[in-house]
Amino acid sequence: MQYKIKNAVQIKKFSDYYKITVCKNITKGKKSTKFVPKGKGGNNKKLSNSISRSKKQVLEKALCNEWLWFATLTLDPKKYVRDDLKTFIKDLGQFIRDQRKKYKDVKIKYLLIPELHADGKNWHLHGLFSDIPIADIEPHPLKKLSEKGYINWVTYQDQFGFNSLGAVKDPVKCSMYITKYISKDLDKAVTALDQKLYYCSRGLKTAEIVAQGRLTQPINFKMAFEGLYSKSQFVDDYEFFKCYYIDDKF
């Protein structure tokens, strides 16, 4: 049987940060089975939940792991059919496995999100890499990019096409930024192709729940994000927040 918990608090540890989240209501317990007719409303809710869930997963993986490079990976039409996302992902996965075998001391991990070009047909990828073999990189051949510190992954260019990698300078801002690529349009596009909203290495770290409970008094400060149903904020330490809630395992 389902039941609601008001003013629920959850605190998660993200590597060097903590995220405090307060929800007006959360639903716990087993949902009773009932008939729900198919229709536009149900599909829209399912779509919204898929996007929200994927954004949270990407943010967790981005914040809980160490990344050196923000990457944009494209396809050269002379080398690949640019609208074939399935083949792109499959071959890129094999390419990365080959790189790991060749450079065994380089731990290549990735978190990538597909995006359609403005033409609504062809694909490229944005995302994060933990490391790239030094022997395989060079200053970017485009002057406007090399002047900003971007590099070129030479072996990727040889097999796939244009790419650019920039150093991750602010992990939190970069992690927040990449979630913007997960959108309603992307969900529809990848669903039609039976593909995913994002791709990542196995074994990436995720956030750990370190505390949860219920508010015991109103919060007397504004949190960084405040929506209709929840509010949240990243902090270095949550000791100051302990006076606002009581522990509860739900």
Show where each model-derived region lies.
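Right-hand nucleic-acid polymerase module
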Residues: 1-121, 132-250
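Cys/His-coordinated zinc-finger cores
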Residues: 125-129
